[in-house]
Amino acid sequence: KADYYVDLHCGDGFEGLVSYVYCTGAAAPEVAAKSREMAEIAHVDYLVTSMYGTGGAYNYAGSMGIPSILLERGHSSRWCEDLVAEDVHDVKNILRHLGVLRGKSHMHGKPPVEVSPVIYEDAPVSGCWYPAKQPGETFKEGEVLGRICDYFGRELFVYRAKMGGIILYQTISLCIMKD
């Protein structure tokens, strides 16, 4: 039995990302509220409330009544001492906030900015991915976010922003497969 769940991620090998946190939203109101509290203690700039009850251990935990978050920090399945130290600091701070560890928790300036709605795009074709934006960069509705080309440079598909927002994570490998 778990009272709380904190999942630590660093992006898959093909993903670039800016540090952010997911909290579970598809849960009982008190579980979702405690998950959000945990997320707001994290020292990241952005927060996403996931409205899925499945698709990840933290979502499943939330659906089972366990307040949970997923911290994304790092990229490309890489790590460094500074990022590990930030995760350790966040986990200890969250545990202090929850009363699991002694001591006083603290906020890091302002709470993370809620990113909502979130659009997850899949590749409609396989090819070579040429992003126009990097994780952490903002964009306006209609802006080109990236292109998929064939091996000879012929454009197969152009991604345009459906609304203004920020790139939290994206594929950073040249090869992209149709989803």
Identify the residue ranges that each predicted region occupies.
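Structured catalytic-domain cores with a bias toward divalent-metal coordination
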Residues: 1-179
